Amino acid sequence: MPVISNPAVEKSTKDEGTASCSVRSRKRKADVAIFLQDPDETLDSLEMTKKKQYQDRGPWSNEMTCKSPHKLIPTPEKEEHEPNPTNYSHFASLRFSPVSVSPLPRLGWANQDDVWRNMLNKDRIYLRDKNFFQKHPQLQPNMRAILLDWLMEVCEVYKLHRETFYLAQDFFDRFMATQKNVIKSRLQLIGITSLFIAAKLEEIYPPKLHQFSFITDGACTEDEITRMELIIMKDLGWCLSPMTIVSWFNVFLQVAYIRELQQFLRPQFPQEIYIQIVQLLDLCVLDICCLEYPYGVLAASAMYHFSCPELVEKVSGFKVTELQGCIKWLVPFAMAIKEGGKSKLNFFKGVDIEDAHNIQTHSGCLELMEKVYINQALLEEQNRTSPIPTGVLTPPQSNKKQKSDRAD
């Protein structure tokens, strides 16, 4: 991959094209005031003022001081729900129950059960294959990790949102599963084109085509990107609206911090907590084995490592026993994150303070993967020498517990 040298990014004008009827719009509302500022005259002072206000009051609210977010939320009222008729047979090996009760609160703009069923259907329709590299003998799984790490860096340079990156990751993985014998020299073209498509879907002001070509240091021309764009969209069947990992995580964290009578329209969770958990997702997505799990399961399992089982079950609709396999798989990644230290919220020129956590950052995940491999080897060795697997604790057997009680 070429080394990125922080080029001067031009401000892109708003794309005037309308989205296809088969692809729902993912555009955000523009903060017009920010984009009307003269960056050479007023933007610097505006950012300094906002940053000072942020430091004085904290992100969104003073609830940041609470270490256990579940303590802030009253238990929602349970309602009777219709069984979900969706067929989950292709996830049978993961032992997920076919019926998942909606954890969403009452919504003023839609039926919460319909929204939840649609979210679950996304994971059923948009399938991934962790073994797709078997179709490409010239490629190795670590090449995917290098590519995704580079795409994170591109996103940070152009101030693209996390959702844009995770869309690109999904497009890349699903497209590669439809292909055979892709050569190494085409991998970067597929990756940057996936990001190009994702940016046009998600960003208000996506970078220009020539900027995507420029960031590859001339390795991918504009014509090659436009031709590959059509190939990718056709082979994906124009299915370009998955429920990404970070989309699931946003919903779960919002449910964790939602208060009564709120309309579930704007984020209500602390940014600092958000970036700690999303760093774990950024790291684990570099491993091809993440494709073994549905995106919702990955997001819920990541939350498990930063909260309590009761909260995870409440906000995700999954039982911890259903998440156990993914939780254990994430243990080496969580250990590496802990060893690397706490993440800090980054601020970007031209990006509103309240949106800073949504900008995809490049935090050296590729280097952390070396620690992950070391942790995986250590845990495997412990599992061989210990009868009790590490990662997830299990209660003692009832007969042993009775003997222990009698001895006392």
UniProtKB/Swiss-Prot annotation:
Molecular-function annotations in GO: cyclin-dependent protein serine/threonine kinase regulator activity
Protein name: G1/S-specific cyclin-E1
Biological function: Essential for the control of the cell cycle at the G1/S (start) transition.
Subunit text: Interacts with CDK2 protein kinase to form a serine/threonine kinase holoenzyme complex. The cyclin subunit imparts substrate specificity to the complex.
Similarity comment text for this entry: Belongs to the cyclin family. Cyclin E subfamily.
Location in the cell: Nucleus
Location of Phosphothreonine modifications: T394
Keyword annotations: Cell cycle, Cell division, Cyclin, Nucleus, Phosphoprotein
PTM section of the record: Phosphorylation by CDK2 triggers its release from CDK2 and degradation via the ubiquitin proteasome pathway.
Chain spans, region Disordered: 1-23, 56-85, 385-408
Family annotation (Gene3D superfamilies): Cyclin-like (1.10.472.10)
PANTHER family noted in UniProt: CYCLINS
Record-linked PROSITE patterns: CYCLINS (PS00292)
GO cellular component labels: cyclin E1-CDK2 complex; cytoplasm; microtubule organizing center; nucleus
An annotated GO BP: cell division
CDD domains: CYCLIN_CCNE1_rpt1, CYCLIN_CCNE1_rpt2
